[in-house]
Amino acid sequence: MSKIIGIDLGTTNSCVAVMEGGEPKVIPNPEGNRTTPSVVAFKNEERQVGEVAKRQAITNPNTIMSVKRHMGTDYKVEIEGKEYTPQEISAIILQNLKASAEAYLGETVTKAVITVPAYFNDAERQATKDAGRIAGLEVERIINEPTAAALAYGLEKQDEEQKILVYDLGGGTFDVSILELADGTFEVISTAGDNRLGGDDFDQVIIDHLVAEFKKENNIDLSQDKMALQRLKDAAEKAKKDLSGVTQTQISLPFISAGAAGPLHLELTLTRAKFEELSANLVERTLEPTRRALKDAGLSASELDRVILVGGSTRIPAVQEAIKRETGKEPYKGVNPDEVVALGAAVQGGVLTGDVEGVLLLDVTPLSLGIETMGGVFTKLIERNTTIPTSKSQVFSTAADNQPAVDIHVLQGERPMSADNKTLGRFQLTDIPPAPRGIPQIEVTFDIDANGIVNVRAKDLGTSKEQAITIQSSSGLSDEEVDRMVKEAEANADADQKRKEEVELRNEADQLVFQTDKVVKDLEGKVDAAEVAKATEAKEALQAAIEKNELEEIRAKKDALQEIVQQLTVKLYEQAQAAAGQAEGAQGAQDAGAKKDNVVDAEFEEVKEDK
């Protein structure tokens, strides 16, 4: 069976892993890094992903970051006259990770397990699945990030029963999950979180502080300057990371702006204490979902056996201190928090292929599901933190006499009124026979699969007429749209490959020009001038083709020059061999002469024996 890769599609960074030799292993990207920034940039119709896209974000307005925050919404971004959905941008990142995995494994990869924040709703999960399809991946399973992290720790190898709290503070989302582990079964008991809280927000408080300090000193608002703002963002991110290891850091941004007297520089010392003061309310915001998850699980902090930290932002000392204070437990930090989720996704991939045995994952739905009933009331059919997959049915009736149809309005959330919850979709059950209100029996069934994706059926028990939908939110993509995007993504991948080959061809041509100059110089006066002239002429023809950027011409001229240079190189080699042979002959003669010169004539006397 082909390998199933595990992908952590993060807000700020993404990571890909695979099972190898019974262990999950992170796959490095072409630059050799173990995580890839979730950044996509477009430049002259060329797509750039990862570090290269992040580096030029300052000068390129067509750069998209933190697109995960828009998954499951109708957000679109226009780039070079074309509109892109969050699913398409995410698919570009997934394609990049898929290519890294294929280069590493030496085989085509078509299947993946992708992780999502535990608190992602149905629309966000469906959007993630669509992104996978667009990238050419069959998404075998969508699993929650905290659950994946628990899998990565290999805790199923422990004999005793354990209750684990996973605290996951990523770049743009925050989740906390409580899991119960016994006999290789990971059962999620409760989950809570905030999809609008993460490391980006910690960066932002530093940026706001820098902007305020600079304005106080120079009366210039840097937040209005796009270039300055990008430099501030980079500096804030670096300062945040520095303050995890040291108690103060220097922020130095020369020529950040200009005033009447000339250029202005930003110089500021940021202490860990100041950073903790600025971010105190963000840290506090993570504790409320932590308390809610414990309450939903019916546990007190003292009943926890272990606390696991996930996500780069958990390196912040104030965050570690807060969770330690809240749970009374020293957080367990055995695996790199940036990689642990991808490793867990790879383990789940191994479970699905049969490479990993004795592990069973039971996840939960993060939000309650139900329908709108009379008076705009939200009637729950499936309560939050119900183990999935699951199915639940309930019988409803009509609200008016002779009502020919019922509208089924499917919602997800915790509020009592429908208007305050998120609409997942609507559909209609028609052709209900005329009858007084309250008589028709309409059975509504909710199914949630192992990916947390919802299917809803409505059935008239009197006529057995049935209507069903797989929930597709207003921002979701139809199958036709996904198929179109898949074709576009494949075409773009081909175009990207073609562009890569073009760049490599130009590089090879430039290298050959340099090599020709060197060979011609080395052969000066040693071969026929006509041969040197022929090589020089072919070199100039190749340079002209490079100038014109005619690829087929570059290829033809390169091949022609390659042949000439090869012949010249052979001659150069032969001459070097001949010179070496001559030098060896001369050395041999010299050694023989030296031996002759060193002969000493000895005097001797012949003694005749007496017979």
Swiss-Prot record:
<protein>
    <recommendedName>
        <fullName>Chaperone protein DnaK</fullName>
    </recommendedName>
</protein>
<dbReference type="InterPro" id="IPR018181">
    <property type="entry name" value="Heat_shock_70_CS"/>
</dbReference>
<dbReference type="InterPro" id="IPR043129">
    <property type="entry name" value="ATPase_NBD"/>
</dbReference>
<keyword id="KW-0346">Stress response</keyword>
<dbReference type="InterPro" id="IPR029048">
    <property type="entry name" value="HSP70_C_sf"/>
</dbReference>
<keyword id="KW-0067">ATP-binding</keyword>
<keyword id="KW-0547">Nucleotide-binding</keyword>
<dbReference type="Pfam" id="PF00012">
    <property type="entry name" value="HSP70"/>
</dbReference>
<comment type="similarity">
    <text>Belongs to the heat shock protein 70 family.</text>
</comment>
<feature type="modified residue" description="Phosphothreonine; by autocatalysis">
    <location>
        <position position="173"/>
    </location>
</feature>
<dbReference type="GO" id="GO:0051082">
    <property type="term" value="F:unfolded protein binding"/>
</dbReference>
<dbReference type="GO" id="GO:0140662">
    <property type="term" value="F:ATP-dependent protein folding chaperone"/>
</dbReference>
<comment type="function">
    <text>Acts as a chaperone.</text>
</comment>
<dbReference type="GO" id="GO:0005524">
    <property type="term" value="F:ATP binding"/>
</dbReference>
<feature type="compositionally biased region" description="Low complexity">
    <location>
        <begin position="579"/>
        <end position="592"/>
    </location>
</feature>
<keyword id="KW-0597">Phosphoprotein</keyword>
<dbReference type="InterPro" id="IPR029047">
    <property type="entry name" value="HSP70_peptide-bd_sf"/>
</dbReference>
<feature type="region of interest" description="Disordered">
    <location>
        <begin position="579"/>
        <end position="598"/>
    </location>
</feature>
<keyword id="KW-0143">Chaperone</keyword>
<dbReference type="InterPro" id="IPR013126">
    <property type="entry name" value="Hsp_70_fam"/>
</dbReference>
<dbReference type="InterPro" id="IPR012725">
    <property type="entry name" value="Chaperone_DnaK"/>
</dbReference>
